[in-house]
Structures are given as structure tokens and as C-alpha cells.
Amino acid sequence: MANIITRRSILGAGVGMAALAAGGETLAQSQVRGDASVAAPRLPIENGATLRILRPVRFVQPDEEVFRASAARFSQQTGVQVRVDFVGWEDINQQTAVTANTGAGPDCIIGFGDSPHIYADKLVEVSDIAEYLGKKYGGWMFVGEKLGKRHGTNNWIGLPFGGTAGPLVWRKSAVKEVGYDAPPSDLPGFLEMCKRLRRANKPSGFALGNAVGDGNGFANWLMWSHGASITNESGAVSVNSPQTLAALNYQKELYPTFVDGGTISWGDISNNQAYAANTCWVTSNGVSLYFALKNDPATRAIAEDTEHSVMPLGVANSWPSAPLTLNAMVFKHSRFPNAAKAFLTYMMEQEQYEPWLNANLGYWAHPLNAYRASAVWTSDPKITLFRDSMNNQFWNGYKGPISEASGQANAEYVLVQMFASVAAGQATPDAAMREAERRARRIFRRG
């Protein structure tokens, strides 16, 4: 869907402007404090500048309304015509690739995490605006800096906009029924809880299908909580390790405790459906599942019985989860790079960003420290945990550099299929690990 914004169309923004106005009222009581003494970079907007912006579709309606309204206000203040296209999540990577490889299309894409690293040579450096925003708003959180900077440099090639993590989602009543106040934070204890839930006919379930978010997220958690990784710090393939073998053996014990029929065919919405249907009582998911349950009278009772907590750490020092991150890029083919950078800066200033963050109900978490004080994080105690999603110390391709190869390994579900083959009884843990190593070596040699 597209939206052309001009000076004349400002008044047609409708509900979006109303949403932004409501956000402005919230700002009057905001606890977010930016440093007004930090000087903004000088970005003289090019004569006759127009912009086309591409980003993923909304999670909740106010996301789009507030985003469009803020873009409209940018047009009003600068005279720059802005077109905003919202495209499906499954299409954003493909459209990013086409734009980068053809040198034509949107001036700016707010894509997903590793895209700027894949197409770094096609992008305008954005260090000036990233450093300004960091200084003004308390510094960048770990994932924001990790995904924003080109590996091994201080040069910013992306501008992280927000991220969403997938913690443990669980039913209080079921967990209490099997003897716990909350899921154990250690791996043996968590396995024992899942066994008890299975015996109580209230099983857990985690995706082992080719699911972009949930499948990769679960496989990564299994790896990282055991100290395993697909590559080491230098980027060499490291999947063949005692730690990976331990993760596979753990999953071999865990999988029989899952829902009837198993989860090898689960996609990204399968666990949502099973949880809402009372066939799965513990899973992992973003905040979307909770709000979908809360907003439907038929499932509101499930939402009231739902809690979130960090997945068991195992040997990790922090939550072993890599947030799915929105990461903005400005392309070299744009005739108006200053206008594009000015737009992104404007959208991340408090007057625009905080209402947008609050409107997303916790689905997207901020990458700048000052926004920890935003009202959304205390609006419902069940979502406060998501506030620090962008400070998780993990990323896709951990422990190595973010690269085209690390993105490809994720896209080809190398780790997911390794665990799934053991769960299905198609391979022993050792054989599955060696096959994953073979695939990873092919990908990282090519990358």
C-alpha cells in the first residue's frame, strides 16, 4: 500500500493525525529526557527533493497511523513530498535486494537487521545522524550499535529503528498446577517442568518448522543457552562442537514433551493458534500473541492467565535471544540523501518516536536508552520485560561478523533443520551436527 504525502494532503491524514495529537498529550507528561544541547548535523535538503520510503506492514493499526502522520508533519515542515509504502514482511528482503542490485527504487528502506551489512557498498553512510541521536538520547543499546555499524569500524551503515524479541509465554495456572510459581531459569529444571506439563496434558510447544521468527528463534536459543554458535568470533564455522552436541541431546529429551503431533511443521503462527486453542500452554513469542488474546473477548481469560519471562539462560550471561530488528538504509542511488537522512532523524526525535513507540504497545522496543522511560513500558506489567530487548547480547550469526553469509544461513534454516532432523528421528545428534557443518561451510565459503 502506498501513501503520497504533500502539503495539500496534510489535512487528509485523518485518524493518523488524531493519533499523533494524542501522542503529543502523552509527551507533556513524558519521562523521556533528550539532551537539547546536542547540535544536530547540518543536512541542507536538496532543491526539489522527494522521497519514497519502504517499510514492513504494521503490527497494530496505530503503528501505521502514527508513522504516516509523522511523515506528513515532516512534509509540512520541509516541503518534501514523501511517499510511504508498506509491504509484507515476507517481501521486504526481496524488495531490498532488488533495490540494491538494480540501483533504482526507494530512497530509503526500513528493512530487517542484517540487510545493511549485506548491501553495505550500496548505502550512504549515516554516521552523522546516528552519532547525533546517540548523544542526544542516552546512547545506543547493544543490538542497535551492533546492527548499525559496519563490522570492525565505527561507520554507521544502518539506523536501527526498533526490535522485537520472543520470550517465554506461559499459562500461570498450568505452571502452578505442576508445582512451580514460574518456569525454572535453568535448563534441567525447565526440562523437568515440561515433562510434568506433558503428564498433566498441558504441554509446551516450540516451532521446529521453517518459521522465520519462531523457528530460528527457538533454534538459536537452544544453541546459545548451551554456549554453541554457528561461527566463532572470526567468522569461521564452529557448529561442530561439544556445545552443539549438548544442545541437540537436550532437544532430543525436550521434544517428546511437546504438543500432540509435534512442531516440526509449525510456521510462525502455529504456536499462536495452539496457545489460543488451549492445546499449548508454554511457548515463545513476541508481545503480539498476548495482545491478540487480550483484545478478543473469547480469549481474554487466557491473556489474564498469561505471563512472560526470559527463556532459560543456560550458560549464557544474558537473555539468549536476537531481536528481530527494523534497520533503516539510505541508498546511494537516491538523488536526495540529505532529505532521506533528515527524514530518518526526524522520525527518531522524541516528538515523533515516542508516540510511535507507545502506539506499538511494546511490539517494537527502542534502540536508544532514553526511551526506556517511555510510558508504554509501565502501561502493563506483563510487557515490561520487552523494554530491554535491544540490549540482548546476541545476533543472527553470533559469534561472528554480521554478513550476507550469516543472513543466508538463517534464511536456509540450517540450525532449525539440524534440530528438526533429530526431533523427527531422521538423524542422530552427531550426524545432524555434521550435516549442519557441511551446509554452513558451503554458505560461509560462498559468502
Model-based region annotation:
Residues 98, 106-107, 133-174, 317-321, ...:
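A structural signal for short loop-to-beta-strand junctions that line the ligand-binding cleft
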Residues 30-45, 112-167, 191, 303-309:
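Hinge/lid segment of periplasmic solute-binding proteins
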Residues 36-39, 140, 306-310, 358-414, ...:
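Long, aromatic- and glycine/proline-rich binding clefts that accommodate carbohydrate-like moieties
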Residues 69-141, 173-185, 272-274, 278-282, ...:
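Extracytoplasmic "Venus flytrap"/periplasmic binding protein-like
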Residues 37, 43-46, 81-82, 176, ...:
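Conserved C-terminal helix/tail region of periplasmic/extracytoplasmic solute-binding proteins
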Residues 194-196, 234-265, 311:
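Glycine-centered hinge/linker elements that transmit conformational signals in sensory
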Residues 148-161, 166, 191-237, 280:
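Extracytoplasmic/periplasmic solute-binding protein
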Residues 1-18:
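N-terminal secretory signal peptides and thylakoid transit peptides that target proteins
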